[in-house]
């Protein structure tokens, strides 16, 4: 009897800390369902994670790009360059690869596999590690830009106005970038939003969180949308090592703190902070009289490697044990810890999902792109976060922390966060909406492969 060949799926994640883990969680799930999975990784930002994912094959594209290219080009220009460089390399790999590839799944920001799949007549789906609201907001931004309806970036009062037919988002909440020009951003978003030729869109989100946006996405692109998240909560999810080394001693420090007393601060893997803002944040945390755990990546504050510029009073607070500073933390474990009462972050979607799934309310300080969209969702739709806007001042930082950790308002927000956590937990259990969406996704991929 002839051996039945496994269905082979090629998956292409974006080489960034905020993108890789969710794609690898999806890969683990598909592998558990009997698919043969090959991950195509970039040489840029490479870290060998193969030992964490037995049964999954890995191939590295020699893109010749480095961290210095990000610094010299800027993030936006780097992403455009990455897609340009990697398209012929992927085509060469597929042409010379011994194993036949049946299906391609690619991250929305590394869209070069879409063109390769079309040239080689391979079925494909796009994976979005972003919120569905962000996907829609990119289109809203492009439409308003094309129609000349975007307010100038210095027209503050107009930027505060609600975008027509996109309540509750203001113009200032749309996913502008701090990393390049509007013209180049439109080129990126046009490619990222080119999804109608895909056989489906996979979102790391949940129907219980974004039902209306998921429905809108399905209507807009005319293809099935699979809200399968939060993927880090699926039963088959395996731990994807961080691209940064985690300092686990912070968990021992948390054990010494009172329940729901700690404000955890992490601005993600890409966001940068000015030293003036960092000083105001530091003093605000000191003046709040709450214990704090602060993740400060080397170089993330105005490119500085040393923290010598932070005030002596802050350093003394850390020395005395009320504060703890690390270069990177095991974030999911931190957020699940009983001592953590709030999460100060940039509004990145991974941080939002991890906070929601842990029942932890947030203070959001968005910087660029989807962070503004997510922050508006958290603060005005789900009401589980505060947004801290304008110029940072230590008094405002102190007040925000105390509102969240100490005041009645924060307790009510924590209750809403707990309810949202329970809804998300239910969505990933058997018969939950995300679990069913994963099953539908598996069936759809099998059908597409078998029909070839």
Curated annotation (Swiss-Prot):
It comes from the Eukaryota. GO terms for molecular function: quercetin 7-O-glucosyltransferase activity. Its EC number is 2.4.1.-. InterPro entries: UDP_glucos_trans. Keywords: Glycosyltransferase, Transferase. Gene3D superfamilies: Glycogen Phosphorylase B (3.40.50.2000). UDP-alpha-D-glucose binds at residues 269, 329-331, 346-354, 368-371. It holds the Pfam family UDPGT. The keyword Glycosyltransferase applies. Belongs to the UDP-glycosyltransferase family. Possesses low quercetin 7-O-glucosyltransferase activity in vitro. This is UDP-glycosyltransferase 76D1. It comes from Arabidopsis thaliana.
């Amino acid at each position: 009897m002839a051996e039945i060949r496994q269905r082979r799926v090629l998956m292409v994640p974006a080489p960034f800390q905020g993108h890789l883990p969710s794609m690898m969680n999806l890969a683990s799930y598909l592998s558990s369902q009997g698919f043969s999975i090959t991950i195509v990784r970039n040489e840029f930002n490479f870290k060998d994670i193969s030992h964490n994912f037995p049964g999954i094959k890995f191939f590295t594209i020699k893109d010749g790009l480095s961290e210095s290219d990000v610094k010299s080009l800027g993030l936006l220009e780097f992403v455009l360059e990455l897609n340009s460089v990697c398209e012929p390399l992927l085509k060469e790999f597929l042409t010379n690869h011994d194993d036949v590839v049946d299906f391609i799944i690619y991250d929305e920001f590394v869209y070069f596999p879409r063109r390769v799949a079309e040239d080689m007549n391979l079925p494909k789906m796009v994976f979005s590690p972003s919120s569905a609201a962000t996907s829609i907001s990119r289109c809203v931004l492009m439409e308003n830009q094309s129609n000349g309806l975007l307010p100038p970036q210095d027209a503050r009062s107009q930027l505060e106005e609600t975008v027509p037919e996109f309540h509750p988002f203001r113009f200032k909440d749309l996913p502008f970038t701090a990393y390049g020009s509007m013209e180049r951003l439109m080129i990126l978003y046009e490619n990222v939003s080119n999804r109608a030729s895909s056989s489906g869109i996979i979102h790391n989100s949940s129907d219980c969180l974004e039902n209306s946006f998921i429905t809108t996405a399905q209507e807009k692109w005319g293809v099935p949308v699979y809200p399968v998240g939060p993927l880090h909560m699926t039963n088959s999810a395996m731990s994807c090592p961080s691209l940064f080394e985690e300092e686990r001693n912070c968990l021992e420090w948390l054990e010494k703190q009172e329940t729901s007393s700690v404000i955890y601060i992490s601005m993600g893997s890409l966001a940068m902070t000015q030293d003036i803002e960092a000083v105001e944040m530091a003093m605000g945390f000191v003046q709040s009289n709450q214990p704090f755990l602060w993740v400060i990546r080397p170089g993330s504050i105005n490119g500085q490697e040393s923290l010598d510029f932070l005030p002596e009073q802050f350093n003394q607070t850390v020395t005395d044990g009320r504060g703890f500073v690390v270069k990177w933390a095991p974030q999911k474990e931190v957020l699940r810890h009983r001592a953590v009462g709030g999460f100060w972050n940039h509004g990145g979607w991974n941080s939002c999902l991890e906070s929601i799934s842990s029942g932890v309310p947030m203070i959001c300080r968005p910087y660029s792109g989807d962070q503004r969209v997510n922050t508006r969702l958290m603060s005005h739709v789900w009401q589980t976060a505060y947004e801290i806007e304008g110029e940072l001042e230590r008094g405002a930082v102190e007040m925000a922390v105390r509102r969240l950790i100490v005041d009645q308002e924060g307790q009510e927000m924590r209750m809403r966060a707990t309810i949202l956590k329970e809804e998300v937990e239910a969505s990933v259990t058997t018969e939950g909406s995300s679990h069913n969406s994963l099953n539908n996704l598996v069936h759809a991929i099998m059908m597409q492969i078998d029909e070839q």
